[in-house]
């Protein structure tokens, strides 16, 4: 591993749809992240402990384990990175999940609708990699 690899931010894309998870990981890699994807959240706690990603993208609707229970796992595990909630559910559902995650102390950077706007995802990931705070990202996205 060279020095550049050691300084890359790590992103983990969690989605039961392997195509979606891999697409997010590829976009993140093009933005300079060391990116991985996983489709089975049952191993998430181990991966968080061993790999310690700085950014995690989470699909809320997965057959094996729903996103809300994953939010509980993230809280219990002390995840302190940025969380991007991604779902094909309506805006109310995504915003409610974002508020729940924030209330549990998670650092929600944004919530995105599937299919993901790749340009918006690239911009968001670039801003996160450059250290822009999540709250500032949400305010900018809302035109505040």
Please describe what each predicted stretch is:
Residues 69-76, 89-111:
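Alpha4 helix (beta4-alpha4-beta5 surface) of REC/receiver domains from two-component response regulators
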Residues 37-55:
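Acidic, metal-coordinating helix/loop segments flanking the phosphotransfer/catalytic sites
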Residues 130-144:
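CheY-like receiver
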Residues 7-19, 24-28:
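Conserved acidic segment of CheY-like receiver
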Residues 39-40, 66-72:
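Acidic catalytic/metal-coordinating carboxylates
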Residues 92-93, 113-129:
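C-terminal output helix
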Residues 62:
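Receiver (REC) domain active-site loop signature in two-component systems and cognate sites
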């Amino acid at each position: 591993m060279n020095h550049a690899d050691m300084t890359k931010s790590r992103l983990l894309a969690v989605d039961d749809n392997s195509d979606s998870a891999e697409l997010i990981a590829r976009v993140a890699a093009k933005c300079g992240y060391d990116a991985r994807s996983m489709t089975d959240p049952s191993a998430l706690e181990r991966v968080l402990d061993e790999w310690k990603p700085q950014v995690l993208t989470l699909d809320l609707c997965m057959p094996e384990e729903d996103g809300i229970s994953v939010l509980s796992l993230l809280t219990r595990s002390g995840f302190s990175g940025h969380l991007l909630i991604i779902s094909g559910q309506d805006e109310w559902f995504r915003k409610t999940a974002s508020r729940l995650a924030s209330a549990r102390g998670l650092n929600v950077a944004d919530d995105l609708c599937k299919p993901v706007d790749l340009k918006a995802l690239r911009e968001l990931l670039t801003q996160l990699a450059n250290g822009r705070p999540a709250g500032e990202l949400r305010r900018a996205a809302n035109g505040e």
